[in-house]
From Swiss-Prot:
It comes from Pillansia templemannii. The gene is rps4. Part of the 30S ribosomal subunit. Contacts protein S5. The interaction surface between S4 and S5 is involved in control of translational fidelity. It comes from the Eukaryota. This is Small ribosomal subunit protein uS4c. SMART domains: Ribosomal_S4, S4. InterPro entries: Ribosomal_uS4, Ribosomal_uS4_bac-type, Ribosomal_uS4_CS, Ribosomal_uS4_N, S4_RNA-bd, S4_RNA-bd_sf. Signal peptide: none annotated. Its main location: plastid. Residues 82-143 form the S4 RNA-binding domain.
């Protein structure tokens, strides 16, 4: 994880740790001139590691985004941001996306009153995300919500009721609220040159 954030910069979905300010400069000095391929590859890796996807999963999302109407890069980011594991992370119900994935896999999370144990479940507007009514489930979420730093930093497509451990998806995410600094066009370019 630390090698990844040193090389690619902050990846809030993977870890809350930040790269040291000097390490960025060292990487640039060590690497010399970066090729266009390397720049595209690093953007793709940043996206992959932030959302915790395998190469095959990311490729599948790129294909889905390519078939949809509109900007492929923007649609790709929307698809990734609307995954259940990412929504839990953005609501502050988990400290990282792998942590959110574990909550989902262990069946602690309900969507519209039904248990969903698939982290890649695509949330839709008006979905209500809650925890199971068990003490253990609530305790796990309570720890994260209590330590979540700024409720006012919540993206505008989400609302949370921290006392009822309930989150609401208001709408599809707007691109300015994406939680990662990334040039998504470079990711799309990377895959378009692979085929």
């Amino acid at each position: 994880r630390f090698k990844k954030i040193r090389r690619l910069g902050a990846l809030p979905g993977l870890t809350s740790k930040r790269p040291r300010s000097g390490s960025d400069l060292k990487n640039q000095l060590r690497s010399g001139k970066r090729s266009q391929y390397r720049i595209r590859l690093e953007e793709k890796q940043k996206l992959r590691f932030h959302y915790g996807l395998t190469e095959r999963q990311l490729l599948k999302y790129v294909h889905i985004a390519g078939k949809a109407k509109g900007s492929t890069g923007q649609i790709l980011l929307q698809l990734l941001e609307m995954r259940l594991d990412n929504i839990l992370f953005r609501l502050g119900m988990a400290s990282t996306i792998p942590g959110a994935r574990q909550l989902v896999n262990h069946r602690h999370i309900l969507v519209n009153g039904r248990i969903v144990d698939i982290p890649s479940y695509r949330c839709k507007p008006r979905d209500i995300i809650t925890t199971k009514n068990k003490q253990r489930s609530k305790a796990l979420i309570q720890n994260f919500i209590a330590s979540y730093p700024h409720q006012e930093e919540l993206p505008n497509h989400l609302t949370i009721d921290p006392f009822q451990y309930k989150g609401l998806v208001n709408q599809i995410i707007d691109s300015k609220w994406i939680g990662l600094k990334i040039n998504e066009l470079l990711v799309v370019e990377y895959y378009s040159r692979q085929t």
